Amino acid sequence: MPLRLVFMGTPDFAVPTLLALSAYGHDIAAVYSREPKPAGRGMKLQHSPVAQEAQRFGIPVLTPKTLKTDEALAEFRSHDADAAVVVAYGMILPQAILDAPRLGCYNLHGSLLPRWRGAAPLNRAIMAGDAESGVMVMKMDAGLDTGDVAMAERIAITDAMTVTDLHDSLARLGADLMVRAMAALERDQLQLTRQSEHGVTYAAKIDKAEAKIDFARPAQAVLRHIHGLSPFPGAWCELPIDGEAVRVKILRCASATGGGAPGQVLDDRLTIACQDGAIRVLQLQRAGKQPMQADEFLRGTPIAAGAVIV
């Protein structure tokens, strides 16, 4: 028998899971999402991607600023949910909320726990050079991503993969995984395993101060840095354009052969020397402009070999 669920999520990453659970036939009693925020040129208030999808399907949407009040708890309990599904909600759940659903609260997390607990697991996995990532369904407890694990799926991280690529792959995998987990819960067959205390790492929130590219690092580290921050906040450097140093985000790159002083442009294809080896820029973005392929950019704004990028 399908479950009665409360769904809690905010960004695009959570949308496939909401849609998959609804398509399976579960009763989505309510959707909780973060409050609307100003966005766009007019800075008008906009609901989150999850809230917009829920409204499209006529599912009640709640956007409380806190879940710690008696009123918020009473409202949450009023949904009489079998379970809550939490995907990138963006708010810590108090113990009283965790205890409210009959079968508990289940979180979809974008890492292979206990590695990369915390806010930015996708970015940190790429930036650290991890060979793989994945998604896990865990039963939530009061800790930070410390709950018992129910199911997991793994995916290889390639050199060409950006956070966007990993995000989209894990969002699809995660939706299927949560459907399977809720089906097992529905049949009282969901098995839980305690997380290991070994290999725990924390994925700190990305700070914009991390975004500047340091070409004095090894080429592989520079590539991972760029792809781990693409598209947001975007790893940046300053290109010499018309006699000025212009800040540009590099969104995609590839390993390249060649050597020179760190930051030196080695050819007319925007191959840049690093501490050892080089990278070739594939996609970049100037402030206020749309992303461009490097060859298209260079046709209008050539960067000569020998130039130095800082």
From Swiss-Prot:
- The region annotated as signal peptide is none
Q: InterPro entries from the xrefs?
A: Fmt (IPR005794), Formyl_trans_C (IPR005793), Formyl_transf_N (IPR002376), Formyl_transf_N_sf (IPR036477), Formyl_transferase-like_C_sf (IPR011034), GART_AS (IPR001555), Met-tRNA-FMT_C (IPR044135), Met-tRNA-FMT_N (IPR041711)
Q: Please list the reactions this protein catalyses.
A: L-methionyl-tRNA(fMet) + (6R)-10-formyltetrahydrofolate = N-formyl-L-methionyl-tRNA(fMet) + (6S)-5,6,7,8-tetrahydrofolate + H(+)
Q: Which Pfam families does this entry report, sorted A to Z?
A: Formyl_trans_C (PF02911), Formyl_trans_N (PF00551)
Entry GO terms, CC: cytosol
Residues recorded as binding (6S)-5,6,7,8-tetrahydrofolate, renumbered to this chain, are S111, L112, L113, P114
**What enzyme category does the UniProt record give?**
transferase
Q: Which UniProt keywords apply?
A: Protein biosynthesis, Transferase
GO MF term list: methionyl-tRNA formyltransferase activity
Q: What is its EC number?
A: 2.1.2.9
Could you say which protein family the record assigns here?
Answer: Belongs to the Fmt family.
Q: What's the protein here called?
A: Methionyl-tRNA formyltransferase
**Originating organism:** Rhodopseudomonas palustris (strain BisB5)
